[in-house]
Structure formats: structure tokens, C-alpha cells
Design a protein with these regions (language model features):
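Conserved, well-folded catalytic cores of nucleic-acid-processing
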Residues: 17, 33, 53, 74-82, ...
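Short alpha-helical segments that sit at the start of domains
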Residues: 1-12
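Intrinsically disordered, acidic Ser/Thr/Pro-rich low-complexity regulatory segments
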Residues: 83-337
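N-terminal helix-turn-helix
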Residues: 24-79
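Short, flexible active-site-proximal loops enriched in glycine and acidic residues
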Residues: 21, 58-62, 82-91
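Short helix-capping/hinge SLiMs at alpha-helix to coil transitions
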Residues: 16-23
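Hydrophobic residues on short alpha-helical segments
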Residues: 11-15, 72
Length: 337
């Protein structure tokens, strides 16, 4: 949709004023915003035209307007500059640096800690996933006896990460059992993509190991198919947002399903992706999810996202998200703080 520059400036101003005040924006407030460079009559005409285009809505009989979902989509696609971490004030940058310096670098602890800090910093909910690579697989298995009836299955990924799972064997497990089944796993499950784990392959491994050791085989299968883990922090901030809190139950339900949560916050490409709640399935009107990919080294990538109202302060929050994603990737890659 081609739109005159003046209409674009007015839409941009209404998005900013509505984000700050939470009330419909009238021509008088707009005139003050533009330092009286445009008359109230001119602004009323332009607002009426933007309403006809479907970019503004009039929520009640007052003269004020608010951005529609279509208006926010146009703003996000055409009017807001690509966020740059360099746009952050030095004080905000140093504060984020200090936050990461205090975090545990272990991925399973770093991801929720980063999401929690991002939520507290922005006043939105924040979500993140542990890093993953499209072609990640298991390169080596070890099976360690940790008790008479328990074995720890350790898997080293092709990116050098370690996954573990404990299996219980009701009939007991010897050291020889652990060594033999480790050999079996290394012959049958290393460098196998999750989608290639056929029922026939798993049945053959259980047959070779014996039924009593099948829990160890199942633990190894779970390690092969483990995907990125998603977490949600700061949900309490959504409960304070009148236009978002009705969606809180839906959001929590999505995050109870790790695969659905990971897909929800997955950005498109390397740029910041903003998804309006009305475009989601199920729809979450009044909500917006802004996500960014982070690079964790070795081909590993993850996602970090802000979840809040469609009237969030995009110009302030997107550079914060951009810098947070960069810092999270650096910390994951072990590049220091």
C-alpha cells in the first residue's frame, strides 16, 4: 500500500502517542506533537482518511483514534527503522552487560536467566529457546552405571554439547551391560537424524539389547529427538496489561508444549520479526510477539522474544531485544562478557 509521507508521519505519531498514553489520540494532542505545524482541521481530515484505509479505528464516540491491527502491521513493515543495538544508550548497554556477567553460562541456566532479565528490564513477558542446529545429531554415547538399577545415558552432540538422561532397569544393570549397550548405541544411533528414527530401527536395537535393557534404548532415543527447550518468563507483566491478560491462559497453554512454544517465537530469517496476535492460531488479539534469532557459534541458533501489547514502545524495546540477542549468542559461544 503506497501512502503519502504526511499520512505515514501521522500514523507513526499515533502509534507512539497511543503507546505512551493508552488513550485514543485526538487531533489536539497530535497538533501539539507536531508543534502546531499541522492544523487540527488538517489532522482530522488525515485521520479520517487513515480510518477509511483501515489503518485507524475509532473505539467509541470520541474524536480520538487508535491504530488498527492493519495499522500496526503497516507501521511494523514500513515505518519503523530496523532496530540496531548501536541505538541503545550507553547506560542501557552497560546495564545489560552487567546482567549477563552475573549469569551462569550453562545453556540450560543461561536461557531462562536471560529471559527473566529481559522481562524485568522491559516490563513485557520474555521467552527464549536453547540453541539448536538444523543438522545437529548425536556423535557419541556413553552409558554409566549409577546404581544397581540405574544407568546414566550421556550423549555428545555433533556441536560438542552434552545431553544426559537416567534410565531405570528393574532387573539390575552390571558394568558389562553398560559397556555393551554403549557399543550398541554407538553403532546404531550416532549421526542419525531424528526424522530417521524409524520404528524398525528402534525395534532392532531393543531386540539386540534384550527386553530388560529396553529402558536404556528408550532413553537414548529421547536424547536423539530432544529439540530446543523453550521457556517463558515475566508472565506476571502480561496480567497487568488489560488488552493482553485475556490471552494469558492461551499463552501458558502454548508454552506447556515445547514444540509449539519454539515455533511461536521462531523469527523469520535474521531480522527482528513482529507477529500480531490476530495473525496467530489460536488468535490472541491485542498481543504482539517480537522475536530475534541469536547465533551461539558452531552453527547453533536460538530465539529470544518479547511478548506484550500491540501498543508496546517498539522504538525503545526493539533495540533492547536486538542487543540482548547479540549478548545471549556471545555468552552461549563462550566469547566472554
Amino acid at each position: 500500500m503506497a501512502m503519502a509521507a504526511r499520512k505515514q508521519r501521522i500514523l507513526e505519531a499515533i502509534v507512539a502517542l497511543y503507546a505512551n498514553g493508552g488513550e485514543p489520540v485526538g487531533s489536539g494532542l497530535l497538533a501539539n506533537y507536531f508543534d502546531m505545524a499541522l492544523s487540527s482541521a488538517t489532522l482530522r481530515n488525515e485521520m479520517a482518511a487513515l480510518t477509511k484505509l483501515g489503518l485507524l479505528e475509532q473505539p467509541h464516540t470520541s474524536a480520538g483514534r487508535v491504530p488498527s491491527a492493519q495499522g500496526y502491521r503497516y507501521y511494523l513493515d514500513h515505518l519503523i527503522d530496523a532496530p540496531k543495538a548501536s541505538a541503545l544508550p550507553d547506560a542501557d548497554r552497560r546495564h545489560i552487560d552487567d546482567l549477563f556477567a552475573a549469569m551462569d553460562a550453562e545453556p540450560e541456566k543461561l536461557v531462562p536467566a536471560a529471559a527473566r532479565s529481559l522481562a524485568d528490564l522491559t516490563g513485557c513477558a520474555a521467552a527464549a529457546t536453547t540453541p539448536q542446529a538444523p543438522d545437529l545429531c548425536i556423535a557419541h554415547f556413553e552409558v554409566v552405571q549409577v546404581g544397581r538399577y540405574s544407568a546414566a545415558v550421556l550423549a555428545v552432540t555433533s556441536a560438542g554439547g552434552v545431553r544426559t538422561r537416567v534410565a531405570r532397569v528393574d532387573t539390575g544393570l552390571s558394568r558389562d551391560d553398560a559397556a555393551n549397550i554403549a557399543q550398541l548405541l554407538n553403532r546404531g544411533l550416532t549421526f542419525v537424524a531424528p526424522q530417521d528414527l524409524s520404528p524398525m530401527l528402534m525395534a532392532s536395537l531393543v531386540l539386540a539389547a534384550g527386553e530388560r535393557l529396553s529402558p536404556v534404548i528408550m532413553a537414548a532415543q529421547a536424547l536423539v529427538t530432544t529439540g530446543p527447550q523453550a521457556c517463558l518468563e515475566g508472565a506476571q507483566y502480561l496480567a497487568k496489561m488489560p488488552d493482553v491478560r485475556q490471552n494469558l491462559g492461551t499463552l501458558l497453554e502454548i508454552f506447556s508444549d515445547n514444540e509449539a512454544a519454539t515455533e511461536l517465537i521462531r523469527p523469520e530469517g535474521s531480522r527482528v520479526t513482529a507477529t500480531l496476535g490476530c495473525d496467530l492460531d489460536p488468535a490472541m488479539p491485542g498481543c504482539c510477539i517480537v522475536s530475534k534469532r541469536y547465533l551461539a557459534g558452531g552453527g547453533l541458533t536460538g530465539s529470544v522474544a518479547l511478548i506484550g501489547s500491540t501498543r508496546m514502545e517498539y522504538e525503545r524495546l526493539l533495540p533492547i531485544l536486538d542487543y540482548f540477542a547479540a549478548k545471549l549468542g556471545q555468552s552461549m559461544a563462550g566469547q566472554g562478557q
